Structure formats: structure tokens, C-alpha cells
Swiss-Prot record:
Protein name: Nucleoside diphosphate kinase
PANTHER family: NUCLEOSIDE DIPHOSPHATE KINASE (PTHR11349)
Pfam families linked: NDK (PF00334)
Cofactor(s), by name: Mg(2+)
Annotated family: Belongs to the NDK family.
Record's function text: Major role in the synthesis of nucleoside triphosphates other than ATP. The ATP gamma phosphate is transferred to the NDP beta phosphate via a ping-pong mechanism, using a phosphorylated active-site intermediate.
Keyword Cytoplasm carried by entry: yes
Subcellular location field: Cytoplasm
GO cellular component: cytoplasm
Superkingdom of the source species: Bacteria
Source taxonomy: Bacteria, Bacillati, Actinomycetota, Actinomycetes, Mycobacteriales
Active site: H117
EC id: 2.7.4.6
Encoding gene, per UniProt annotation: ndk
Organism, as annotated: Mycobacterium marinum (strain ATCC BAA-535 / M)
UniProt keyword list: ATP-binding, Cytoplasm, Kinase, Magnesium, Metal-binding, Nucleotide metabolism, Nucleotide-binding, Phosphoprotein, Transferase
Length: 136
């Protein structure tokens, strides 16, 4: 069964010119890029995307970071796309939890600047895709 997930290449990934490497890894995993867009993120979109973190101490810095420079937003499709991309991304903390061979393990430096976002469930994927790609 084909599944869809939202993938974001965050500002640090775009600024460090890792977009091609990350997309290549997604495709080599056997996943397909169904939609791809470079965009500047508004504070409104960022607030909606990260709504579950509102009120947490890091919320303001998270919004500041994600709106600081362009991101690449993509709809990624394939069998078990959500779990497959999360495995490819690696643990959220790129130093302590992401293993070598993952995007974060190979390129990440800090927890906040961890290069990519991938939906964590089918429900999140549906909500996030609707936010980032309303006509999809």
C-alpha cells in the first residue's frame, strides 16, 4: 500500500546545500517525490505546523528558525513512506541518537538544527500535507 508523508528540508539543510543529497537518499530508499517546492515559511504556517509545541519553552526559537530562510517542502510517497523516511532521517538529536548512515547522523550538528522533518504518523502526514500543499 502506498503511503504519503510530508518531508521538510529545513533552513539549515538548504543553506548547507544538502538538498540534492537528501533528495537522492529519499529516492535511493525507493520512495518517490510526488510534489516539491522551495518556499519561504510564514509565521502563520509555522505556528500551524508546530501547533502541538505551542506553549513549550522552545516554541519561539523553533518558529524563528523555520521562518529564517527558505525550506524545501515535499510530498514523498511509497510503501511505508512515513516509517521509511523517519528511519532515513535518523534520531532527532543528531549527535546522541542519530546513527551514522542517516541524514542527521551524517550531517546534523544540533537538535534544533537537525536538517529535516518527516511526519510521525498517518494522521500527522494528512494534516501537514493539507497545510503545506492545500491543493494536493
Amino acid at each position: 500500500m502506498t503511503e504519503r508523508t510530508l518531508v521538510l528540508i529545513k533552513p539549515d539543510g538548504v543553506q548547507r546545500q544538502l538538498v540534492g543529497e537528501i533528495i537522492s537518499r529519499i529516492e535511493r530508499k525507493g520512495l518517490a517525490i510526488a510534489a516539491l517546492e522551495l518556499r519561504n515559511v510564514t509565521e502563520e504556517l509555522a505556528s500551524q505546523h508546530y501547533a502541538e509545541h505551542e506553549g513549550k519553552p522552545f516554541f519561539g526559537s523553533l518558529l524563528e528558525f523555520i521562518t529564517s530562510a527558505p525550506v524545501v517542502a515535499a510530498i514523498v510517497e511509497g510503501p511505508r513512506a512515513i516509517a521509511a523516511f523517519r528511519q532515513l532521517a535518523g534520531g532527532t538529536d543528531p549527535v546522541e541518537k542519530a546513527t551514522p548512515g542517516t541524514i542527521r547522523g551524517d550531517f546534523g550538528l544540533e537538535t534544533q538544527f537537525n536538517l529535516v522533518h518527516g511526519s510521525d504518523s498517518a494522521e500527522s502526514a494528512q494534516r501537514e500535507i493539507a497545510l503545506w500543499f492545500p491543493s494536493a
